[in-house]
Design a protein with these regions (language model features):
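Metal-ion/cofactor- or nucleotide/acyl-coenzyme-handling active-site neighborhoods
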Residues: 1-201
Length: 201
């Protein structure tokens, strides 16, 4: 099993990943903001993303690890499923109990949980997860999918998303989490197995 896994999210600070070559297995989320060499898979959790792929408006790179909503989309669109079946590495349907429902479990959560639970990584690097640190939900994926980023939705999303990270850090207490960001003023309490690497351009 891999010692280190890098999950490349779609927030502004994902760019720091590109500064130098990185050792370890790489997972992307939806459509990554740049090309990732030696990528293990792209993770997809959204019904909307599958619809955009089906319409020919997006083409996530590499093989795909898909969640329950993409699985449902494939079941209800069998021709589409046949067309993209060679791209699907697997359907991964696990969800931790601290994610109340699948809509609270975003693509970053999904990719991280897959790396932890399925791949059994010992160290997990998180790049471009700006919403843990700042009130910033800008995402490269928004260029592909029209997302509601209004103030009420921003508040709801950060209220739902951040507690899941806290629970995940506790759940996998023997894993070292490395959060890469432009500052260390994180908005949640973090346990001893989580450290912040402050990156500069």
């Amino acid at each position: 099993m891999p010692k280190a896994v890098h999950v490349i999210g779609n927030g502004d600070c994902a760019q720091f990943y590109t500064k130098e070559p990185r050792k370890g297995l790489k997972l992307a989320c939806n459509v990554p903001p740049f090309e990732i060499s030696d990528m293990y898979a792209t993770c997809i959790v959204d019904f909307k993303m599958m619809s955009v792929i089906d319409a020919g408006q997006a083409n996530p790179p590499g093989e795909w690890v898909c969640g329950i909503r993409p699985k449902h989309y494939c079941e209800t669109h069998p021709r589409f499923h046949m067309r993209i079946a060679p791209r699907i590495k697997e359907f991964y349907l696990e969800k931790p109990k601290y994610a109340k429902n699948y809509t609270d479990f975003n693509c970053g959560h999904f990719a991280a949980y897959y790396a932890l639970q399925k791949l059994k990584c010992e160290r997990l690097h998180l790049w471009g997860f700006d919403s843990i640190f700042d009130f910033n939900l800008r995402s490269y994926t928004d260029l592909v999918i029209n997302s509601d980023r209004g103030n009420m939705n921003n508040n709801r999303l950060t209220t739902n998303w951040r507690p899941i990270w806290q629970e995940m850090f506790k759940d996998f207490k023997d894993v070292e989490f490395v959060l890469h960001h432009k500052h260390d003023a994180i908005k949640i309490k973090i346990p001893d197995n989580v450290r912040i690497e402050v990156e500069t351009k």
